[in-house]
């Protein structure tokens, strides 16, 4: 397949929103930049005739929010976001998310360590954990 055909096919898939975007995956630890990643479970009251779509739209329009998913289980939505500090994430939950009329409750989970993200292994396996070496 020649390069022009690949470029044309990619452009067509972008126009048809088959390819929705491109993302850069950054290891913030290696970059020396502190980031706090949170996964927030949200229980909401769905709107008549709109279901969860309207409240999900309100949430995903906040610039801090990276992703919003409709989920099964005890909560309805999963919201992921990154902040500079725990306080910044807490402020978002307290002042923006929990104040929405449809939001009944939230449960915030902080990411302590990323092992794999978007299909990419984020740990350096060449450095064995000391506990493994002792075994």
Which role does the model predict for each range below?
Residues 1-135:
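A compositional/biophysical signature of low hydrophobicity enriched in polar/charged and small residues
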